[in-house]
Amino acid sequence: MQSAMKGIACLGLLAALCSVWGVAAQEPARHAVGLELRGDTMIYRSVALPCRQGTGNHVWSGYAYEPWTPAQKVFALSKFWSEARRNYVRMDRVGAERWDSLYLSLIEPVRRTRNDDEFYRLMQRFCAFLEDEHTFVAVDRNYPQSAESFGDGWVLSLVTIDGRVVVNEVARAKAAEVPPGSEVVSVDGRPAAECLAGAMLRVSASNERARRYKAAGELLRGLAGTEHEVEFRRPDGSSVRVRLVNVSGEYGDSDLASLPGRDRRSLRAPFRLEWYPGDVAYVKLGSFRPGSAVKAFHDAFPEIQGRARKLILDLRGNGGGRNRVAAHIMAHFSHDTLLCEGTWRTRTYHAAYASWGAQAEAKDTVANPPVRAGFENYRGLALSEPRPHEFRYAPDRESLVVPTVILTDVGTCSSAENFLIMADSQPHMTRIGSATSGCTASPVVYELIPGMHCGICTREVRFPDDREYVGTGIAPDIEVVPTLADWLEGRDPVLERALEYLADK
């Protein structure tokens, strides 16, 4: 509940910028209605709204959609509120009354949003309060905006490391001015840490580490024409100020300079096989989605099985995919015929039970299952009994069991975490790196209004022995956290530690 209160407090503190910092207005506005938290009560207050350069009505001239009406916006807010209240599996951690209070406080600010993007950002903040990576609000509209691409040929990819926002990739033609590894010091005169905190408010994630990880890429997002004055500190200690202007759409695969070994193609590779001395196979598993990655793994497995004496499975940045794919790959590295991805439960509701529990109090539920069922259903607290999620495999299948290290980081999430749950019971497997994202899966998807939909997490997953990881992440057996100095030197200390560990096996 403390995390829920913290989420409310943060949202309440910064939602005074409900006009949404860094976006364009279709209509001029001098004030915006914001929110303020006093105790458990959300109240309104007005704040001055500064205008920004380069954000006029012309931005929307090529927008191909009819803007959402105030009525549609309020309906979308209400639809998301009600479906989350009914389906979100961790609503008991949030508190239904607080969720209701926040919803009521947002009705007027939502109605007054001045354009579609401003409304979308406010919906993102509402969603982020639930603190779950598989609970989201998304749009199908081509907003005239960008996050990494800017005028005059600028492309910047930002990441967080050592608590700082750093340039991971930059357009090669601009690399002499802002080299990879340069730190963002300020944006429009505001400290980078403050700007990052604002971006984090719109990020749906299970903990602060994951929010920070995802928010870096959103730091400079803005509608076309939005100007940013960004101060960078180069790796050599010198400083430079750059004027960046958002464009409409991203440039895609441009010619980029990156930190050594951290180009996006390598980091996002769905599959890669490399060999290290001593017949140590390094296998990059960047995704568990069906398709080319699975085929590449199957094509390479005979070589791995025939040669590898030790194994490194790199799941860093693996955002998941299908649980069945994760289990299928795990089956190649285990002799077990039964693989368990943990136990899961979901929200349940019986209207008749709720009617019987309307007058019940907590003390009445002690040693009284029928009353307890009524009490929980009336208050939206009823959950299904935990069920194991298991996969069975033939005992005579092709598999390879050798000393194995699995590399993880905060980008390891969803079915990649289910893979780690299965690995937890394998004595030959060890986790090295940093804690994972801490999110589960199975979002139920609803259309809110034409052009906007949401997903709401419906399953809570735990280890078979009932250990929790949702919200905190799965900790490694051996923690190794890279530093900016490592990246600048082209070192991968996590991989280095894995090789050291396997050398003794």
Model-derived features with residue positions:
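Cysteine-dependent hydrolase recognition
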Residues: N368, R372, Y378-R387, P395, ...
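A substrate-binding/cap region within the structured catalytic cores of diverse enzymes
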Residues: P277, H335-D396
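Bacterial N-terminal signal peptides that target proteins for export
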Residues: M1-L11
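Bacterial N-terminal signal peptides
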Residues: A9-V20
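Short, conserved helix/loop micro-motifs enriched in His/Cys and acidic residues
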Residues: R392-L407
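Flexible, low-complexity junctional segments that flank or bridge functional domains
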Residues: A25-L311, L315-R345, Y353-A362, P403, ...
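Short helix/strand-capping connector loops at secondary-structure junctions
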Residues: T472-L484
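Extended C-terminal subregions enriched in glycine
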Residues: P403-S425, M429-S437
